[in-house]
Amino acid sequence: MLFFATTINYLDRQVLSLTWKDFIAPEFHWTNTHYGTITALFSIFYAVSMLFAGKFVDKIGTKKGYLWAIGIWSIGACLHAFCGIITSGVVAGRWLVGFADARETIATVGNTTLIVTVSVTLFIIARMILALGEAGNYPAAIKTTAEYFPKKDRALATSLFDCGSVVGALAAPVTIPAIAEAWGWEMAFLAIGALGFIWMGAWMLIYKKPHMNPRVNESELQYIHQDGQDTKKEKEKVPYLTCLKYKQTWAFALGKFLTDGVWFFFLFWTPAYLSAVYDIKSSDPKGQLAIFLLYLISLISIIGGWLPSYFVDKKKMNPYDGRMKTMLIFASFLLIALFAQPLGHISYWIPIICVGIAMAGHQAWSANIFTTAVSYTHL
């Protein structure tokens, strides 16, 4: 369930990056600056929302917290589809139109500045709603991981569900441009956004805490609680500001602050880079294959979750040292991205491979730093 939620999360996030250059920009007269503004504000709002998402999930519980998160971001994802109709209403007074009619109406308006201003504003609003919901995915998923896995296995569990981000990005180039080409970019947002509502129904039926789950037997409960945890006991309430006293809070925050920009930069701009430099469109088979290979290479990140368990079980290292060694190994992968630009003139496959390896390194590194927040607190 966590894997599929994260897959949907990244599918929703990728719709804009795979449609804006070839489908949305010509309609609304966007430039790279407009798209960059939208993605930057999304990232900022996502980061701010993360400050409160974990506390929200702790307060209302894992099950309800996840439902709220995916419900909000699915609504936000679907709202993107109606930005064209609303723009048509604002700039031309035509509100009761379909997607195709809205595009035709906007094309007849000569005031491109107004079209740009209105459409960018609407997409920013939709993006902020998406960010608000998506910020809850990882806190809820990590909390679920802490409930179902002992400390030594959490990095592996985290890397497995975090692979949903890669699989989501992997599925995106072979589905989203095809939907946009066949039925319009609006349907791409609606179709992918609807997946979240399907997931919500399954989550309501399936999720239960381990000690309340009839599919978890006593020996499995003992394995889960081998670190001395007892989910039946009332947890100590930790004030929000008290978290700032923990070293792992600052280590996690600083680590994500310094590294997430790398992931989001590659995620948001790689399709546009291929289009601008190599004239490879996201809707072309060549472009779909290139992006597919990019994220296929990123699946190497699964090793980042397995390696700490190997160090603990085979090398007798403690979980913390095992994670730190793993993070050091995969941090070196990002250096390969430095060769993407200078060697890119040889073939577009070189930056694809270099960036793919760098993204794998980031995701493996990220899977391990995610576990630090739950392994050294009373979760």
What are these regions (language model features)?
Residues 71-103, 107-116, 332-345:
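C-terminal ends and interior cores of transmembrane alpha-helices
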Residues 126-163:
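Cytoplasmic helix-loop-helix junction between adjacent transmembrane helices
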Residues 17-18, 247-295, 302, 366:
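Extracytoplasmic gate region of multi-pass secondary transporters
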Residues 14, 43-51, 169-170, 298-302:
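Residue-level signature of mid-helix packing/kink "hotspots" within the transmembrane helices
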Residues 1-24, 30, 266-271:
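Extracytoplasmic
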Residues 166-210:
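Helix-loop-helix hairpin linking two adjacent transmembrane segments in secondary transporters
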Residues 377-378:
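Conserved small/polar residues in nucleotide/adenosyl-binding loops
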